[in-house]
C-alpha cells in the first residue's frame, strides 16, 4: 500500500492501531522537527499555531512524494457548516478545527485528501448543570433534563469508520461519523435506571441557563461556553446528523 499521511488532534480509540494492522497498514512514526511550535499556552494563540503546523506537515509530505492524506477532525466542524455566520473568534476551538480542516483540504489539488469528522469525547463543560456529564438538574426523587442530545461514537466504530475513510475515502470529501444521536433523557435512563427522568420545556431551561450565567458573573467568573449553546435549537435540532449515506459511501455498517 502507498504511504499515507495520517493526522489527528482528537484522541483515537485504544483498538485503532490493532484495526489498522489487521487491514494491512503498517504505521510509520515520524518525529516532527523543532520548527513546529507546540509551546503556546493561550488558547487563541495555541490554536492558531495548529493550522500552520498542519500546513507544514502536509507540505513536507507532498515534497516527499506522499500521494494520500487523511485528517481526523471534529464533528464540531460539521455543526459549524450547519450554522454559518458565527463569529469564530469567540470560539477558538471551533475556529481551530475549522481552520485545520480547510487548510488540509486546500492541498486536494496536490494530494488526495479525505477528512473524517468524529464526535468529541469531552464531557459537557463544568460550568453547566450536569449529572453524569449530561445537562440536567437533580432533585430528591427525579432528574430534569430537556429535549436535546448529541452524536455518540464507540471506540470500535470510531476505529472502523476512520479506517474506512483511510481505505475508501474520496479526494476532497468530508465524512461526518457517528454511531447514533443520543438524547439526554435516554443517556440518563441508561446511566441511572432506578431514577425517574423528565424533560422540561426549553423555555425553563433557558431561564435556568440565564440564572447560571448571572451566578457566575456575581462570582467574577465568565462562562466558557456561549449561553446560547444551552438552547434546544442548538443542542437538539442543529446538533444531530444522519451518517447513513456516509456509511454506504465508505462501505461499512
Can you name each region flagged by the protein language model?
Residues 1-43, 52:
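N-terminal Rossmann/SDR dinucleotide-binding element
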Residues 95, 150-153, 241:
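Residue-level signal for the nucleotide or nucleotide-sugar donor/cofactor binding architecture
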Residues 2, 17-20, 38, 236-253:
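Amphipathic terminal alpha-helices
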Amino acid at each position: 500500500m502507498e504511504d499515507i499521511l495520517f493526522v489527528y488532534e482528537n484522541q483515537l480509540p485504544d483498538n485503532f492501531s490493532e484495526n489498522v494492522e489487521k487491514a494491512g497498514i503498517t504505521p510509520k512514526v515520524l518525529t516532527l522537527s523543532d520548527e513546529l511550535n507546540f509551546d503556546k499556552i493561550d488558547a487563541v494563540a495555541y490554536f492558531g499555531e495548529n493550522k500552520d503546523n498542519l500546513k507544514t506537515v502536509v507540505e513536507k509530505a507532498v515534497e516527499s512524494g506522499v500521494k494520500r492524506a487523511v485528517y481526523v477532525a471534529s464533528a464540531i466542524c460539521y455543526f459549524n457548516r450547519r450554522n454559518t455566520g458565527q463569529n469564530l473568534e469567540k470560539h477558538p476551538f471551533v475556529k481551530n478545527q475549522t481552520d485545520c480542516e480547510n487548510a488540509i483540504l486546500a492541498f486536494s489539488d496536490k494530494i488526495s485528501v479525505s477528512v473524517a469528522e468524529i464526535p468529541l469525547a469531552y464531557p459537557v463543560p463544568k460550568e453547566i448543570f450536569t449529572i453524569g456529564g449530561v445537562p440536567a438538574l437533580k432533585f430528591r426523587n427525579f432528574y430534569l433534563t430537556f429535549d436535546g442530545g448529541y452524536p455518540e461514537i464507540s471506540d470500535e466504530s470510531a476505529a472502523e469508520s476512520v479506517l474506512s475513510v483511510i481505505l475508501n475515502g474520496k479526494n476532497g470529501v468530508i465524512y461526518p461519523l457517528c454511531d447514533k444521536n443520543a438524547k439526554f433523557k435516554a443517556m440518563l435512563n441508561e446511566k441511572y435506571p432506578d431514577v425517574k427522568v423528565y424533560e422540561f420545556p426549553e423555555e425553563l431551561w433557558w431561564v435556568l441557563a440565564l440564572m447560571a450565567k448571572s451566578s457566575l458573573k456575581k462570582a467574577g467568573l465568565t462562562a466558557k461556553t456561549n449561553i446560547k449553546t444551552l438552547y434546544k435549537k442548538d443542542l437538539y435540532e442543529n446538533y444531530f446528523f444522519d451518517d447513513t449515506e456516509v456509511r454506504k459511501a465508505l462501505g461499512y455498517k
